[in-house]
Each structure stands twice: as structure tokens, then as C-alpha cells.
Regions:
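Surface beta-strand/loop "capping" patches
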Residues: 67, 123-125, 543-581
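Solvent-exposed strand-to-loop "edge" motifs in beta-rich extracellular domains
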Residues: 132-136, 177-179, 538, 579-581, ...
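Extracellular and organelle-lumenal recognition/adhesion modules and their flexible linkers in secreted
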Residues: 22-286, 304-306, 319-332, 339, ...
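Catalytic-core region of carbohydrate-active enzymes that cleave or remodel glycosidic bonds
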Residues: 297, 391-392, 398-401, 419-422, ...
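Substrate-binding cleft/loops of secretory-pathway carbohydrate-active enzymes
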Residues: 316-326, 333, 362-365, 408-439, ...
Length: 657
């Protein structure tokens, strides 16, 4: 991701507000079948920014569960006699705590965990606590969820006891069922046994039992459901800038994210410190949400997985020194990582990496079809590193499609340099990114009309409408995204994938906005941009249908009254998407050409997204403040009339009878 200086935030809005109401005739050509729309056309992109993984989609409620943060007790408060040791049972997570009798009957030993901005719990729901532990003699632990802000006689809202008994490390489990709903509870562990006893604790974990698909140690249900409800065709992960790392040592390494969660090593998160004005010193990656879980989620929601791997370049925004990057002649381990990932996803269960997948519970291949190499890279440094990756992958896995990059900008010198390089190298798709202002989105209605159809396909991998002084989610920005997406759809022969970014944000832990889905510890809401994405996905269609006004694409051009439109066909249904970026109601005439003899078009329904609250969105308090509404839509024949509200987006559904 790259930030841009946005200029003239109201220029584009004012430029279309003067458009007057008019009768706009759309000519819709049904004579010939247009370009097929790929199943991957609309999808999602996950990056661990804004506490998207730990504290977000990954449902673990304990922060620093294995005491591996640089400050081993960050997230914890200790009382009594607590030591941190580093010869634990898990090689890549060696730290643990030793609790010892404090030596006085009125003193206590134990520890509290604060969770991620608190621990959200719901009255009557079940929570699964687990810990790896050992002791020389039996030790009783009291496990509690507490409300330290309570004015009641007791802080605890539920408690259970477990007995640690054995010199060898073993996992112990209890269930907790709180009698209150709290957004900011605390997990407390009391050592009750006295007499000089001690107990060692490692990998202390707390999960809701009600996770996505009911998986133990799984995903937060409401957030995963928000992804499934988008019906995405492609799922890009895990980034983004974290793929590169601030330095190569801290890049995202997929091999560290598979296998037992207890032995997945901690990694820093570059979004902890990238923006000093929004600094989060407790933001790390536990890798509990790893590549197996990403592949599994892709399968759950019916999306093709698109993993992105390091090309050997650290973040170029943060590193001017060539020595920060891997020399081209030393790329072999990075290339092998890519080949091994394909084996992990697709290899037989008796192969080296396929066996790890099988041991994790998925003996069948994940049927990986795409892989991305590099993120927002630029200059000759990138293509000279990408080339050996492409050669190696083509040789070993010729059917895998490779995604390259056009860099962080939507136009300019680097963009113009990288596109020919991607063609020369034979990349299958090129990832374009654009976080741009109002006027850019209004000016891009014909962006892809003149792209070379003989080269790589386009992946619009990161985009969102940003506005100076209004860099938050708001309705008008979402409307302009909807307008821009008509160009993606109309050019589906060259644009094969598109994903909004970023995906997730915690209301107390964000570094970047706007974002698609927001949440606190108990609630979540879907933004207006989420509903735009869903409408495009639900009414994706199978093939593009030609739609013009005065012989030109309806793309906000001169004389088109701020209208953007596209049309697709699915069987006997036609879906027409129209964005009205003017402040006037617009009359529409749909003129259908090429209907078979005696066939007519029948209006079925319309879905309208409309609001006069241009700079508002949904929120935790008002999650359905602005949402699409299904309305009636009448008419039958070769010509059908409709109207569209000012500053609104509509999907018109018609049936060929």
C-alpha cells in the first residue's frame, strides 16, 4: 500500500452536480455473446493490518499467549512469584512462565491477560481455555474471566479449576461460561496450591466455542461470515506489505505458519510502527492464522486462493540500500519456497509438504491455480528477480498462473516501465493498485478500453476511493467505487480479478482507512463499500453485454449526465448496473436490440443503494444506516423505462421471455 497526496477533494463532485435531469437512452446489444466473466472477477484481499488477524479474524482472545513478544510479559499483569524461562517444549516458541507459591498465606501468585483491547465475552456462551503445563506435584489453578470495572461484590463472571499433575508437558483444558456480556473482560489465572509448589505454563489460550464452521481454535464467526456473504471468486493473501517486510528477516514466511500452532514462531508486524502517528507497540503476528487456514477458508467460501510470496525484495519504501535485498544469484531459497508452497497446496499426501497438509487434516489437494510473486515492487530490481521465479515455476508447474506487479502507482513512469516488463516475462496477470481521490475515480470510466488484449490480464488487486479531509468510509466514496467498477465489468475480457483493500479494521486498532469491514470485540458492521462489492458479486453474470449511449460506453463521458453503466447476462437474465454521480434524478430508457422473434424483456426487480448522507456510513451503533433496498421494477417489451435517484447506484434485473 502507498499513501498519496490527494488534491481538490470537491472538484469532481462539483463537476457532476451541475448535470441536469435528462432522458438517457441505453442501447443494449443482445445479438452476440460478449466476453466471459471469470469466476475470479470479484474477490477479497486479506492483509494483517488494523488487527485483521490476531484481535480480528483469528478468534484467539489471549494476547502474547506463548510469551514470545520482545517484552515477554507484554499483555500480561503478574502478581506474586512469576518467572519467565526459555527452555520450553516448543523449539520455536521456547518461553514460558513458572508460578511459585509466594510464601505467605495472604499473598497470591498468578497472572492476568488483557486480550486485544480487552476480551469480548457473551453471557451464556462457551469459551474453551487451554494451557500446556507441568508440575512436580499436583497444582490446582483457578481460571477466571473477570470484570475489573465491576462495582459488584465479586469481579469474576465465571471460573473453573483444573489440576496440573505430571512432570511432562501436557495440554489441559476447561470450559468457561460467563454470566455477563462484557466487551473488555480480563482472563485471570490463580495458583491455589501452596506448600512451596510451583507450576510451569506455556501457550495459554482462550477461544469462543462458537467459531466459523465450529472449528476448534478457529475463526471469528461474524467476520468469516461477512467474507462468505460477499461470494468472492478470488482470495488474495497474506498481503500486501507484510509479504515484503520492513526487512527480509521480518517478511512473511509461509513455512513458519503451518504445522502445530504451538510451534509457529512469532513475527513482528510492520504495521506496528509504520505510522508513528498511529503506533501500536503490541501488534505482532502469532501466525495462528496461517497458510493452511487461508487455504481452508478459501475452500469454505468458494474462492480461488491466491497466495503472494516474497521475491527477495524488502519494502522499497523503507529501504534505499541495495544491500537490504537478496542478490539475484542468491534467490534459490526464495524460489524453493514458492515451489514448496505449490507442493503444500497441491502435492500428494505422501510428498514432503503435502504430508504436512495432510497431517493438518486435509489430505486432498487444495487445487491451487494462482501464485503471486512480489507486492508493490518497482525499478529493474523487480523484473530481474521475478524472471528466475517464472522460469522455475513454469518448468515444475506449467499450469500455475503467475501474478506480477505494476508497482504502487496507477500510472506514471514506474507503471509504464513495469507493464512491458511483465509482458516480456510472460506474467499471466498484472496486479494494479490505486488508492485515489474522487476525481480519479470519476475519470477512469474508460481506463481499460484500450488495454492491449494480447498481453497479461489485469488484477485490480488493491483499490479504494480516498478523499482529502474525508479519509474515512463514506457513502459518496462508495458510490464512486461503484461507478469505476462498471469499467472493470465492461472490460472483463482483460480484467479478470478485482479486490478492494484493506479488508478488515478494529475500531480501536486501525492504522489505515477506509476499510471494508469494521468491528470491536463483540460486534461488526459492513460498510457501504462492502454492499457495493456484494452487489457486483451477486449479479456478476456469465458474459458481458454491450451497452452504449450515443454510440459510446456509458462511462461518465461528456453528455452522459454523470452516468456510468455496464450490463451482463446470466442465462435468460440481464443485469444492468447504473451509477448516477449527478445530483439530479435521471430518466433511463433501456433499448434492447437483438431479441429473438416474439421474445420480450420483462422487468423483474431492482436493487437500489441511495442516500442523501454523502459523508456518512454504517457503524457499530448503526450497522444498517445505509444499505441496498430491493424495489419493484415494471415494464415489458423491447424498450423499458426506469429512473435512478441522484447520487445513487442501482442494479436492474430483467428477464428474457
Amino acid at each position: 500500500m502507498k499513501q498519496f497526496r490527494l488534491i481538490s477533494p470537491v472538484f469532481a463532485l462539483l463537476s457532476v452536480l451541475s448535470a441536469g435531469a435528462a432522458n438517457n437512452t441505453f442501447d443494449i446489444d443482445l445479438k452476440k455473446t460478449g466476453a466471459p466473466i471469470q469466476n475470479t472477477m470479484y474477490g477479497i484481499f486479506f492483509e494483517d493490518i488494523n488487527y485483521a488477524a490476531d484481535g480480528g479474524l483469528y478468534a484467539e482472545l489471549v494476547k502474547n499467549r506463548s510469551f514470545e513478544f520482545p517484552n515477554a510479559l507484554q499483555g500480561w499483569k503478574t502478581f506474586g512469584n512469576v518467572q519467565v524461562l526459555d527452555d520450553g517444549p516448543f523449539e520455536r516458541n521456547p518461553h514460558y512462565v513458572r508460578l511459585t507459591d509466594p510464601g505467605h498465606a495472604h499473598k497470591h501468585t498468578g497472572l492476568d491477560n488483557e486480550g486485544f483491547f480487552g476480551i469480548g465475552i457473551v453471557r451464556g456462551e462457551q469459551y474453551n481455555f487451554s494451557v500446556w503445563a507441568r508440575s512436580e506435584s499436583p497444582v490446582v489453578l483457578r481460571v477466571e474471566l473477570v470484570n475489573t470495572a465491576s462495582m459488584g461484590e465479586n469481579h469474576f463472571v465465571c471460573q473453573q479449576r483444573l489440576t496440573v499433575n505430571g512432570k511432562e508437558w501436557k495440554q489441559y483444558k476447561v470450559t468457561l461460561r460467563p454470566n455477563e456480556t462484557l466487551e473488555k473482560a480480563t482472563l485471570r489465572i490463580f495458583m491455589e496450591t501452596r506448600g512451596g509448589a510451583s507450576v510451569d505454563l506455556e501457550h495459554i489460550s482462550l477461544f469462543p466455542a462458537d467459531t466459523w464452521k465450529g472449528r476448534e481454535g478457529g475463526l471469528r464467526k461474524d467476520l468469516a461470515q461477512a467474507l462468505a456473504d460477499l461470494h468472492p471468486g478470488i482470495f488474495r493473501f497474506p498481503g500486501g506489505c507484510i509479504v515484503e517486510g520492513t526487512d527480509l528477516e521480518t517478511r512473511y514466511n509461509w513455512k513458519n505458519t503451518v504445522g502445530p500452532v504451538e510451534n509457529r514462531p512469532l513475527n513482528e508486524n510492520r504495521w506496528e510502527y509504520t505510522f508513528p502517528h498511529r503506533f501500536y507497540p503490541d501488534y505482532f503476528q502469532s501466525y495462528g492464522l496461517g497458510f493452511f487456514e487461508f487455504f481452508q477458508l478459501s475452500e469454505d467460501i468458494g474462492a480461488e486462493p491466491l497466495p503472494i510470496l516474497s521475491c527477495g525484495l524488502a519494502c522499497q519504501f523503507q529501504n534505499d540500500d541495495i544491500n537490504a535485498h537478496v542478490p539475484v544469484d542468491q534467490l534459490d531459497p526464495y524460489i524453493q519456497d514458492a515451489l514448496d508452497l505449490i507442493e503444500f497446496a497441491n502435492g500428494p499426501a505422501d510428498s514432503k509438504w503435502g504430508k504436512i497438509r495432510a497431517d493438518m487434516g486435509h489430505p486432498e489437494p487444495f487445487n491451487l491455480k494462482y501464485i503471486g510473486i512480489g507486492n508493490e515492487q518497482w525499478d529493474a530490481l523487480y523484473p530481474e528477480r521475478l524472471e528466475p521465479f517464472i522460469k522455475a515455476i513454469r518448468k515444475a508447474y506449467p499450469n500455475i498462473k503467475i501474478v506480477g506487479s505494476s508497482g504502487p502507482n496507477s500510472e506514471g513512469d514506474q507503471f509504464d516501465y513495469l507493464w512491458p516488463e511483465m509482458k516480456r516475462l510472460g506474467a499471466d496477470l498484472v496486479d494494479e493498485h490505486f488508492y485515489r481521490p474522487y476525481e480519479w475515480f470519476l475519470s477512469q470510466g474508460t481506463r481499460y478500453d484500450n488495454y492491449d488484449r494480447k498481453g497479461p490480464k489485469v488484477f485490480a488487486g488493491e483499490y479504494a476511493c480516498h478523499a482529502t479531509g474525508k479519509k474515512w468510509n463514506h457513502y459518496y466514496a462508495s458510490l464512486l467505487e461503484a461507478a469505476f467498477m462498471t469499467d472493470l465489468e465492461r472490460n472483463a475480457d482483460i480484467v479478470n480479478m478485482a479486490t478492494y483493500a484493506p479488508l478488515f479494521a478494529h475500531v480501536e486498532g486501525w492504522q489505515w482507512r477506509p476499510d471494508l469491514i469494521w468491528y470491536d470485540n463483540l460486534h461488526s458492521f459492513r460498510t457501504v463499500s462492502w454492499y457495493v462489492q456484494q452487489l457486483y458479486s451477486l449479479y456478476k453474470g456469465d458474459n458481458v453485454v454491450g451497452l452504449t449511449m450515443n454510440g459510446k460506453p456509458v462511462a461518465g463521458q461528456d453528455g452522459q449526465n454523470g452516468l456510468f453503466a455496464s450490463a451482463v447476462r446470466e442465462g435468460n437474465q440481464i443485469y444492468i448496473k447504473v451509477a448516477n454521480t449527478s445530483d439530479k434524478e435521471q430518466q433511463l430508457t433501456f433499448n434492447f436490440n437483438g431479441l429473438k422473434k416474439k421474445a420480450v424483456m420483462a422487468a423483474s426487480k431492482r436493487i437500489d443503494l441511495s442516500s442523501d448522507k454523502l459523508y456518512e456510513d454504517n457503524s457499530i451503533e448503526a450497522p444498517v444506516n445505509i444499505v441496498p433496498v430491493e424495489n419493484g421494477f415494471d415494464g415489458k417489451g423491447q424498450t423499458i423505462q426506469a429512473a435512478i435517484n441522484p447520487l445513487s447506484f442501482s442494479v436492474f434485473v430483467l428477464t428474457i421471455e
